[in-house]
Amino acid sequence: MESQRAPSPQRLPPTDGFEVLDNAYLLEEETYSWYSPEETYHVQIGEVFQSRYQALGKLGFGSVSTAWLCRDLMGHEYVTLKVFVSGHRQAENEEKVYRYLKTIKTSHPGVAGIRSLRDSFQLPGKRGPHECLIHDALGLTLGEIREMSDGEKVSTDLLKPFTKCLLVALDFLHTKAHVVHTDIQEGNVMLAIKDDAIFKTFEQEEMDEPSLRKIDGDRIIYASRALDVPDDASHVVLCDFGDAQFGSKAYGGEVMPDLYRAPEIVLGIPWNEKIDIWAVGMMVWDLYEGKHMFKERLPSRMESVPAHIARMIALMGPPPVKLLKRGQFSDTFFDEDGNFTSDVKVEDTSLEEEEENSEGEQKTAFLKFLKGMVQWVPEERKTARELMNDPWINIR
């Protein structure tokens, strides 16, 4: 709720004391091959939007947006500003999904695990307007936490409550909102923050040691600044709904990150919320093992499909013929008897062999939990509600 107090004063950012990179160096969002200065809004630290949101520092960047910690001068609190490149479909879709989610009246606890939209507006740009979204400020992504962890593996003390929190959110998303996220991955799940001391520290550090940057005329590219990890980290929030879908029982087309693609995506089978369950399995494996389950990355998505399928066969066994009959692209990779026809070799391995972070009963319990998600047939994957009651996730 908006405060009745007078607006907070604006902070003046430092005008010196920062390192400036040579313009030949590509920094952060510039490293994407599709980056276009004309399609990007270059936020400047200290800039105020809508006469109320002052940018304090850069939190991160993605393929179509940048994220900034801001101070809401009217509400006297920290928020996150997400600024999209001009004219990208994800911006419109993300706002549409958030507004739809707001219309759902429910007491489901999973609502707390879904990022909410506080405000939205547009900024003018050279190639059209830039959509901007204002959210509650959140902490690090699970990917950032993994990178900071020993051996890039997240401890079960954190991973289990994080995963359970995500599954509760997905139960709401799938059963009450009937939304398929389609892009669940470690970069789209973030820590909920109860104490804004972390944001105060971020703000003060930016004042004391201003971020490295690149200055090219009126265009400034900043290096992102990391947030601290709270002592009471246990709750996470699912974010980034730019590719989410709702309004149908089944969908078609290419979705999901390359390395997380479910069988129905590569085989051309109509998909539903069970692709999110597959993705949770991929993400939990990444965080627990410190490595990807699927590794093949070739220049194009289609080029990597045979290797992706070969890896699936190695880890899950051959797909049921009944499933292949549902696939638009199945005959490209399999004969009518379900034999894999690609030249790509199927490794002699298994999930049991590749799981290296536990042993004994712990390993058995983890793999049982994982296999509730990593299944060829979508209907054989467990629901989010079934998974959140799994023994592995509830035994500390």
Name each region found by the language model:
Residues 1-396:
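Intrinsically disordered, low-complexity regulatory segments of kinases
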